[in-house]
Amino acid sequence: MIFEQQMDLLKKENKPEWTRPKFPDVSGIKQVAVDLETHDPEIKTLGGGWATNKGFVVGVAISFEGFDGYFPVRHERGGNFPEEDVKKWLRKLFKEDPIVLCHNAVYDLGWLRRWGVDCNVTKVYDTLIAAPLVD
């Protein structure tokens, strides 16, 4: 019975519809969490695609006070935002010089730079580095 209930939850008609976010105003943003989703087929053999020019950004997840959103740019099933619109908005965001939070910041910020979005901010916190220090 429990298995059937769990399977029922997985059926498409029970999944909430994803709503495309709008680009919110970023003026005055103090801190932002950033996570990139990428297609990086040769990461295990050549390293990060941002450094080897292999692969591409698939989407960008952003969270700051009052906003949590995901901006797909190269999903195979569509629903993508125009890449240039996302890049333009990200450039505005980083010009506010927020504290940037990432998990594996070298990777995400490397991809942003390869993608044409410089994240020249004063402070970056990396939870990949911080996590072992907390334990």
Language-model regions, residue ranges each:
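Conserved RNase H-like, two-metal-ion catalytic cores of nucleic-acid enzymes
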Residues: 2-135
